[in-house]
Each structure stands twice: as structure tokens, then as C-alpha cells.
Design a protein with these regions (language model features):
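Short, His- and charge-rich active-site/binding loops that engage polyanionic ligands
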Residues: 1-7
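Short conserved micro-motifs on helix faces and helix-strand junctions that flank
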Residues: 1, 56, 78, 142-143, ...
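S-adenosyl-L-methionine/SAH cofactor-binding core of RNA-modifying enzymes
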Residues: 9-60
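SAM-dependent methyltransferases
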Residues: 130-172
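Structured adenosyl-cofactor binding patch, chiefly the S-adenosyl-L-methionine
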Residues: 64, 68-115
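Short hydrophobic alpha-helical segments that form membrane-spanning helices or hydrophobic packing faces
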Residues: 11-12, 66-67, 94-95, 152-154
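Conserved RecA-like P-loop NTPase ATPase core
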Residues: 4, 59, 146
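Internal, active-site/partner-interface "lid" segment
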Residues: 89, 101-140
Length: 172
């Protein structure tokens, strides 16, 4: 109803599907991926990783019937200020960013806890072997063995990188 360009996913099959799934499983959140949702950030990912079951609804075309949103959806999430053909890619981004925070998903669980944005900063530069590649050397501090100084260097580099590339993260 209301006219306008594009098709809208019909309410009846969507409602049947959601109700059928909800009879089998209790969902902590029913999430709709939409450009007009709250922008996904690390805080949302952290919160969702603590939930048990999530049901993610992906729109297509012009979206879904508003009544689905009103009746079933508990959270609306956007991955950015742009439009995709459907919500499937956005849902994949959400699933990947949340799952990696669940204990046992990654081999090194501390890796996810030290990622960019976990402490509000971008990650510092990282290096691999060899120590010298075509005249480009790993910073000397990283080969010093002084763990306290290395950690301070990493913090300083993370802050500086954030200040240069994403100063908006420091304004909060």
C-alpha cells in the first residue's frame, strides 16, 4: 500500500516463518538488517556475543512489511550509510563479527579481545619475520625483549594511528 517504486516482502510468509522458528527456539533478539537501523559497532557485537540465540531477518527489494518490524523485531541494525541489494551480506558481517567473540570459536581467544575497537582505539602496526625486509626493519623496541616497553609502544602507536586516521573515535 502507499505506492512507490520497488517491491516489499509480503507479511504473511514472513510471519509464518518467524512464528514457526519461534515455536522451536527461544530467541534473545530478532534482528532486522536495515539501512535505517542502529549502526553496528564493536559494542553491539560484544553485547550480542553474550546472547544465546539470534534470529536475523534480511530484507530485499524495498524491505519488509512494517508490521513485521512492529510485531517481531527487537533490534534493527545497519552496517553503514549505503544500500545493498538485500540484507544477506549485512547479516554475514554481523554473524562474523559476533561469532568471533564467542569463546571457543577462535583458536586464540585473546586475539578477539585485543582487536581494533575493543579499547576504543585502532590496532597498532604489526610485523612478521624477517626482521629486515629489503631495508625496511621492524622497530627496534619490538626486538628488545622488554615487554613493558613493547606494550607501551603498542599503546602509543594505537593512539597515534587512531588520532591520524579516526579522530572521531577519540571524541567520545
Amino acid at each position: 500500500y502507499g505506492g512507490g517504486a520497488g517491491m516489499v516482502l509480503s507479511i504473511e510468509p514472513m510471519a509464518r516463518c518467524i512464528r514457526s522458528l519461534s515455536e522451536k527456539t527461544t530467541y534473545d533478539e530478532v534482528i532486522y538488517m536495515t539501512p535505517d537501523g542502529k549502526r553496528l559497532d564493536q559494542g553491539i557485537c560484544n553485547q550480542l556475543s553474550l546472547k544465546g540465540n539470534l534470529l536475523i531477518i534480511c530484507g530485499h527489494y524495498k524491505g519488509i512489511d512494517q508490521r513485521i518490524r512492529d510485531l517481531f523485531v527487537t533490534m534493527e541494525i545497519s552496517i553503514g550509510d549505503y544500500v545493498l541489494s538485500g540484507g544477506e551480506l549485512a547479516a554475514a558481517v554481523l554473524v562474523d563479527s559476533v561469532c568471533r567473540l564467542i569463546p571457543g570459536v577462535m583458536n586464540d581467544e585473546t586475539s578477539a579481545l585485543t582487536d581494533t575497537f575493543q579499547d576504543g582505539l585502532l590496532s597498532p602496526p604489526v610485523y612478521t619475520r624477517p626482521e629486515d625486509f629489503e631495508g625496511h626493519k621492524v622497530p627496534e623496541i619490538l626486538t628488545s625483549g622488554n615487554l613493558k616497553k613493547i606494550e607501551q609502544w603498542r599503546q602509543d602507536q594505537a593512539y597515534e594511528r587512531t588520532r591520524e586516521r579516526r579522530p572521531d573515535l577519540l571524541d567520545d
